[in-house]
Regions:
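Ubiquitin-like/PB1-type beta-grasp interaction modules and other compact soluble beta-rich domains
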Residues: 1-89
């Protein structure tokens, strides 16, 4: 099935994963690191390298609802990563 991964500050990508996949399985798929500009790694690996872990990357949503790594996705789902806001006024 196809699932889209979108980070608010990046171009979305679409990946092919097995039915009943979890968010963690989707973000572990080869090439998903492209969301962070790292085509050679999975998004989980790229987040670990760049931010020290996925939890430092931001908030996860699936089709607009709050999600965890164990949330199941369905055909056509969109995983949205809302980056943490850094700095301030």
């Amino acid at each position: 099935m196809k699932v889209e991964i979108y980070r608010l500050s990046a171009e979305p990508i679409t990946v092919e994963v097995e039915e009943e996949a979890t968010v963690k399985q989707v973000l572990s798929a080869p090439g998903t690191g492209a969301v962070l500009g790292d085509d050679e790694h999975s998004l989980l690996e790229a987040a670990e390298r760049r931010y020290g872990g996925l939890d430092q990357l931001g908030t996860l949503r699936v089709n607009g609802a709050a999600a965890t790594l164990e949330t199941r996705v369905t055909e056509g789902s969109t995983i949205l990563i809302i980056p943490k806001v850094e700095g301030g006024c």
